[in-house]
Amino acid sequence: MKAILFSLLIGSSITTFAQSTDYVSQVWVADQGDGTYRNPVLYADYSDPDAIRVGDDFYLTSSSFGCLPGLQILHSKDLVNWQIVSAAIPYSLAPHTDTAPQHGNRVWAPCIRHHDGEFYIFWGDPDQGAFMTKAKDVKGPWSEPVLVKAGKGIIDTTPLWDEDGRVYMAHAYAGSRAGLKSVIAVCELNADATRAITQSRIIFDGHEAHETCEGPKFYKRNGYYYIFHPAGGVPTGWQVVQRSKNIYGPYEWRTVMAQGKSSVNGPHQGAWVDTANGEDWFLHFQDVGAAGRLVHLQPMKWVNDWPVIGVDEDGDGCGEPVLTYKKPAVAKQPICTPQESDEFNSNELGLQWQWNANIDEKWYFCNKEQGVLRLYSAPVTDDYKNLWDVPNMLLQKFPAPTFTATMKLKFNPIGKYYGERTGLVIMGMDYAGLMIENTEKGLVLSRTECKKADKGSAETVNKTVKLSSNEVYLRARIVTTGKKIKESEGGHDLVVECKLSYSKDGKKFKEIGETFQVKEGKWIGAKVGTFCTRPNIKSNDGGWVDIDWFRITK
């Protein structure tokens, strides 16, 4: 059991500090403490971000795809310091009978809005259509999602409440499902925004000038309807803004931000927000490959009713992204960051954690009394190939370009049969980990990896160690090298490497196996976390692993 004060292992040294409400990362802080910030303001995979201001508070959500809890919501007072405060989809996504992971499916490009005292989040499910959930309090409870408009390929939905009381929704199409992409459409919704009452009308075709236009965000200002959207592809694109006096067009457009001479490739979709004192800002993502899609904050200004995003040094109306800038002019706020480390001293899972699929309540027990998280071994399916297929993977986003993840665990398998496993995993379409398995020879620690896990490949083991104790410390060291990946794999992404090690006493760690090149997941960045499984054999119970703590350090 751990007290509120705890000792943090960093290599072989010990640092003691107290837990506080405002978590501050050891590995990435955007606020520089001198009135400036550095980008990314969120060095984590908050893909397709959208944000709003309500009073003096800012809220951000992002694509969660098939990960649960879904639609994590972050809160900030200054657009720089963010913490996770809730999730709009706490347990499962429709169809709720799904038990398998839905990699890259389900929740695409949400849009968060506040209207008439309620928070709304719209999103597209590429296989079902446009959904909406709402709540009076951003911390919930959130309503059961409503299918607003059914249709294959409807994605990137964004509502707009007009001054006359009518409600509209703009959206894009996923070519993989709809057979059409690079267009943006608008339909009208009923007054309570729960149902489309007209067919969608295509209002912009980007095939010639702005191919792969997607991710629209709908706004109205000074009598103009504005649609902000990216084009040109995720890693290589640019920001476009359209405007019209008529909601159905015709729209005129401008490119308002592009990479230019900056190092920020393909500044992609995001959100315009203003401060209470009238400053304008734009949050968007940058795809960096293995770590995912990172969130940047750009200054924004209006010139002749056109937005200019970033810094426009040549005055052509198209800005470039900044890497450092002065913070928004709001009241000074304490430095904080999204939660990472977890001492498991609560009766609820930390908001930084997500499972790989709809959540089964039998997977875990938050044992506050003992200060541990207990994961019960869940049986794999008969057609199990590798961990890509496992729903009870408990994972969190990479928090920085370079960091160390360490966990302390105690494995308690059922001795009468073999094959129960747990461990520390760096998860993506390729993955690697330290797996502890109950075998005929006792507990064995394996340095395991799986290339092309998403294609059903089998795991390989490059080193094993017999364990004399069921209590062990596992560690992953993640380093972004500065090198670029091969041109055949995209060329623009930075190489991220992982070294794995273990310890019997938490002081001396021994590296095991080879260096692993980290690979992203399906539309998401790589993640780090754990699991507990057993073979699919008939049994009325299984073993478990008690995780004492999980810590992110330098």
Please give the residue ranges for each predicted region:
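Bacterial Sec-dependent N-terminal signal peptides
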Residues: M1-S20
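Carbohydrate-active catalytic/glycan-binding domains of CAZyme proteins
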Residues: Q19-K554
